[in-house]
Amino acid sequence: MKNFKKWLMLVVCALAASSLLGQEKDWANFGRYAELNKTVELPSKVVFMGNSITEGWWNNDSLFFKNNGFIGRGISGQTTAQMLVRFRADVINLKPKAVVIQAGTNDIAQNNGYISQENILGNIISMTELAKANH
């Protein structure tokens, strides 16, 4: 009976661990605005891309954004690397006339670990290059 309980506990732990490993993690938070992006009237005027500061602008005065054709795409805690990989879905595909990028705060805070200032700047430059290439 002791061996059976140990074996059963081992199987339960293994199943729990395998289910955690099998879960997909949306590191860049692609899903955050996926449904809202489908409802945007194209082309949009301005997309505000950023972190919690940008998200706060939208949350504090969403009527101002809506009345002016502005779209808020800030996500709390985001780093420039995360913003860069979701830039196509949350900015380019919305065909804005302009984009405002507020980025770098969470990189400096090392939310995803250390990143050099050169790489932070490189991510921001890449976003601006993508915006220019698709304008």
Where are these regions (language model features)?
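Serine-esterase "nucleophile elbow" of acetyl-processing enzymes
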Residues: 21-98
